Amino acid sequence: KIPEPDLKNFKSDCIPTSKANLFVLRILGVPSAIDFIPHFANRNGRHYWATAIDPRINSTQVYQVGIYKAPKIYRRTYSHNPTAKPGKREYVPYFFLDPFNKDVTDLYIPTSEIRLSAPGIRNIRHGYLAIFNDLSWQPIACSKPAGQEIIFPKMGKDIVYLPVHYTNKKEMVPFAPPLILYSDGTVHPIIANKDSLQYMKLVRKYPNRGESDYWYSAFIDSHFEAADNPDFKSPHSICTI
């Protein structure tokens, strides 16, 4: 029996939910696995879900894949998959050392490969593509250079990526400018031009999405309060939505 305080404080998200759904499928004898997006490319967070392993339903739509940008989608497997082989004293994020992550991005979304040539690629053992999530750059794909070129296959489109590598001190360092992979498969580097500046005014800091309208309606008639003391005594209403 679970103690009542533990039940009150229990929080669940897509990870335990996906595991519960996975157990149901396996109890029914359905071959299944957990697929996941480690990091979204256009919002904070990630998503995990259980899926049946059947080529006839690989195109089944996952809600979060349809409304958010997925740079990579992986599957947890029993069999080993290729992993990065670190050199002496080379730092590689643990995710890319885990042999039970399989790239299944192309089962869900259109993808393209990214080919990069840049000075210094020859001097790194592994390169990564990172996306911005939760206030920092998160590595999402790993590849090994061949000469002065490095190739990243099966990348999600309409996404900004930053090519990086790691120092022996675990520091992330860009080895090329950030780039955009467009929907037609073309790659465009983003290079700042300090001689041609422009004025930009941001009216919001988070994308406005239609699926959020339901939540927005809950704020109607809400109001903001302010007080001139740390204890927030005798607050005054300053704005009503």
Where are the model-predicted features located?
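A short, amphipathic beta-strand motif
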Residues: 112-121, 203-210
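Residues that flank catalytic or metal-binding motifs in active/ligand-binding sites
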Residues: 28, 46-48, 112, 125, ...
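Short, acidic Ser/Thr/Gly-rich low-complexity loop/linker segments typical of extracellular
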Residues: 135-148
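Structured interaction patches on ligand/partner-binding surfaces of diverse proteins
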Residues: 167-195
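Beta-sandwich interaction modules
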Residues: 239-241
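Short, ordered, surface-exposed loop/turn motifs in non-cytosolic proteins
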Residues: 120-136, 214-226, 231-235
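Hydrophobic/aromatic-rich core segments of domains that either
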Residues: 1-4, 9-97, 101-106
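Short Pro-Gly-centered beta-turn/loop motif in secreted/extracellular proteins
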Residues: 55, 149-170
